[in-house]
């Protein structure tokens, strides 16, 4: 009798495992590879510490190579007409070129190209590529600069991150929003790893933490990156607050202690000293948003890149290959943004510009769209 009960219990467990794990391995929202889907499933079932240890061990023994040349055409060379504004619509000045870390500079490195949908004929989005530092010269990262005089920001919420809902804005991007969409990009960590809160559209999904790095979207579509202060409140002017860890950049310089192995401050997943795919978001002194994303980055590299791109305050967003994605769209002037006219900031980014238009996409993300006049 005991043996039969044991066999039955094992069969029930195996059936559950096949259903649960099998469903996860078939779910594209958990990652592009079977390995990443298994890792997300394991984290959701109490094995976060094992997954984190395994990933740390892997990446610690597979650091990016030192030196070396870039693949052919890895650096985007801007066209001669990329920064010409054709109207007098109020907009920010074209950003100054980024001074590369590695010398000599490669032609086009750090120089901006206007891309994507224009706003009343004026470029609202500029992108560039450069090597992340003077040592790992076979890698390239992407930088996007967004003119928030021309663009409006929005936080889309997911059933996986932050969970809960329903939300007024969630994947897929609808036709009404696709008509003005310029770019979409990843947000932050899973909420149980973000060490911060989540507020959107009058709903406090996760309580906000004082001191946390916060991406704040206001009712007029402008956005900011700040440390959430003890006297700050969610007023009627605030639409969304997405927190993730602590500020990486403050007062236009990297914050102190970035090399400290503090998994609470900089995130338990992969730690802070491992070179992996990372992304970050900052705000410039004149209100533009800057996004940085790419491979082979540690937390210090990411902060240095954000400062070099002009950020006065900045925060880390999501990390790891499957989650770092920035896509921009170039439809006809009155057309809808979509996969067919989308392009990624870096060709090596996992996923495609279609992910934000898929109903299965379950993580939160950020969009910038042409501002209504």
Regions found by a protein language model. Name each.
Residues 46, 310, 342-344:
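Glycine-centered loop/turn motif at secondary-structure junctions
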Residues 290-292, 299-338:
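C-terminal soluble interaction/assembly domains
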Residues 139, 210, 276, 359-363:
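Short, solvent-exposed loop/turn segments at the edges of secondary structure
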Residues 336-373:
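Low-complexity, Gly/Ser/Thr/Pro-rich intrinsically disordered linker/tail segments
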Residues 10, 26-30, 290, 294, ...:
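Catalytic cores of large soluble enzymes that bind and process phosphate-bearing ligands
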Residues 16-31, 35-206:
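Zymogen propeptides
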Residues 147-150, 155-308:
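Aspartyl protease catalytic domain
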Residues 3-21:
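Hydrophobic membrane-insertion alpha-helices, especially the h-region
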């Amino acid at each position: 009798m005991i043996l039969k009960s044991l066999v039955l219990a094992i069969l029930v467990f195996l059936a559950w495992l096949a259903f649960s794990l099998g469903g996860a391995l078939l779910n594209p929202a958990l990652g592009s590879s079977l390995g990443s889907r298994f890792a997300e499933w394991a984290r959701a079932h109490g094995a976060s510490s094992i997954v984190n240890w395994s990933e740390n061990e892997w990446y610690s023994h597979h650091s990016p190579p030192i030196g070396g040349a870039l693949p052919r055409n890895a650096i985007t060379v801007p066209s001669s007409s990329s920064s010409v504004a054709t109207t007098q619509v109020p907009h920010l000045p074209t950003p100054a070129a980024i001074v590369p870390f590695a010398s000599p500079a490669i032609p086009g490195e750090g120089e901006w190209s206007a891309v994507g949908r224009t706003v009343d004929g004026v470029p609202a989005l500029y992108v560039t590529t450069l090597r992340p530092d003077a040592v790992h010269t076979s890698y390239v990262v992407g930088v996007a600069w967004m003119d928030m005089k021309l663009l409006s920001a929005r936080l889309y919420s997911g059933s996986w991150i932050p969970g809960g809902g329903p939300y007024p804005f969630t994947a897929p991007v609808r036709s009404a929003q696709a008509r003005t969409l310029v770019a979409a990009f990843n947000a932050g960590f899973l909420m149980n790893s973000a060490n911060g809160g989540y507020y959107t559209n009058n709903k406090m999904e996760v309580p906000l933490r004082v001191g946390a790095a916060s991406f704040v979207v206001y009712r007029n579509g402008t956005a900011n990156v700040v440390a959430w202060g003890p006297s700050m409140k969610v007023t009627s002017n605030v639409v969304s607050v997405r927190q993730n860890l602590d500020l990486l950049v403050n007062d236009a310089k990297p914050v102190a202690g970035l090399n400290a192995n503090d998994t609470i401050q900089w995130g338990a997943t992969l730690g802070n000293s491992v070179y992996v795919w990372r992304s970050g978001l900052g705000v410039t002194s004149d209100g533009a948003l800057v996004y940085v994303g790419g491979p082979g980055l540690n937390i210090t590299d990411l902060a240095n890149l954000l400062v070099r791109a002009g950020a006065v305050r900045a925060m880390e967003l999501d990390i790891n290959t499957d989650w770092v994605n920035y896509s921009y769209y170039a439809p006809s002037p009155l057309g809808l943004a979509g996969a067919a006219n989308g392009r990624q900031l870096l060709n090596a980014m996992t996923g495609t510009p279609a992910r934000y238009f898929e109903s299965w996409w379950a993580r939160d993300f950020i969009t910038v769209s042409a501002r209504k006049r």
